[in-house]
Amino acid sequence: MSFILTFDIPRELASERKHVNLSLRKMNAKMVQFSVWEHENLSDLIKVAFKIKSVGGSARILEEKFIF
């Protein structure tokens, strides 16, 4: 089962965005679109989401479910 992390980090926090993207790459998450990443480990994504929220960004984690 996969999970999707979507997030938004304010432009003035570009260094934080770089750090988040690097963290996601290191955990082998797959970039679907800018600020939309897919990964199978929910707890890893939750850690990243908390980091994003702690710097003033917004983050959501969705469970991927293929319907058709």
Where are the regions that the model predicts?
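Short acidic, Gly/Ser-rich segments with clustered Asp/Glu that frequently serve as metal-coordination loops
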Residues: E12
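Short glycine-aromatic motifs
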Residues: L24-A29
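Short glycine-/aliphatic-rich beta-strand segments at the starts of folded cytosolic domains
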Residues: M1-I9
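Short amphipathic alpha-helical segment that frequently serves as the phosphate-/nucleotide-binding helix
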Residues: N21
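Short, intrinsically disordered low-complexity segments
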Residues: K30-F68
